[in-house]
């Protein structure tokens, strides 16, 4: 079937099918379907399952073949080399069975995360040279959190702000790291660091209320370095203290690689979600034997946003086109209650 598609369409470089998911006992429990590329699906940020993908040998040779230095995600690497240069397609027929069990490579998340990030960074390294400045903004506020001056709370012997500053400064991708706060005392923390990339901006207290958009603050910050609002801005929320620098850099890489307006960290919602109707509750993501990639629901982890600074001109944080990436579960904790703050202190060690 796949060979026939390539034979009839010489302009195509790659084709892939739908597939069945099979449990450890050999029972089919789901038909995984991908919406038709270029017709119903115009976002090519998600590669196909690599178990049954047909590619022209000539094209495979042109792009250098599969990488042998990767321990996982070689299919994603191949996809990253193809989707911008060649025409690809998919067939809505399930042509293979995929059995999921604990020993699948898919279950080895660390290898997958590391390989995926390496592929993305290698892919965008040259592109990033024309996208400066890359600015990290760490917003802080005195009020409107569950505790006053949340940024000054300590976990693992350091304040949340100190932890975030050090993580951002550890990345060579950032030209500037800016702390924006309505409390002048925040600047004292900033002054502890000698890195020339680090700066402080005093923001208006009215901009910190929950109903206020953060975009005017971001536009003001970025305009200091780029009046024309060029480059990329990354918003890092210190309420997520376990996010590592690799995940922050992946936000940038995902954005640049995709051609979208912004990228966010998400988590797939695996449990059922309901909405209220006139007749009671209705499932938004009904479970069944047949599902497509459009049936999945995701929640914003509120950890990190990478966006092109030009979006601020229209008052938008994300722009119209948003892509996502998955963050390791250990990094996803958000401190928005006193209880979670205490849990974070236990996880970080070192008490206050």
Where are these regions (language model features)?
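Short phosphate-binding loop-to-helix
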Residues: 185-234, 242-246, 250
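Catalytic donor-sugar/metal-binding loop of nucleotide-sugar-dependent glycosyltransferases
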Residues: 13, 68-70, 80-97, 124-131, ...
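Conserved nucleotide-sugar donor-binding catalytic segment
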Residues: 17, 31-117
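Short, flexible, basic/aromatic active-site loop/helix in glycosyltransferases
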Residues: 18, 27-46, 50, 121, ...
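Conserved core of the sugar-phosphate nucleotidyltransferase
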Residues: 26, 216-220, 229, 238-331
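N-terminal nucleotide-binding beta1-loop-alpha1 segment
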Residues: 129-148
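Short, acidic, metal-binding catalytic loop of nucleotide-sugar glycosyltransferases
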Residues: 167-174
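Conserved donor NDP-sugar-binding/catalytic core segment of glycosyltransferases
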Residues: 1-29, 225-230, 253-265
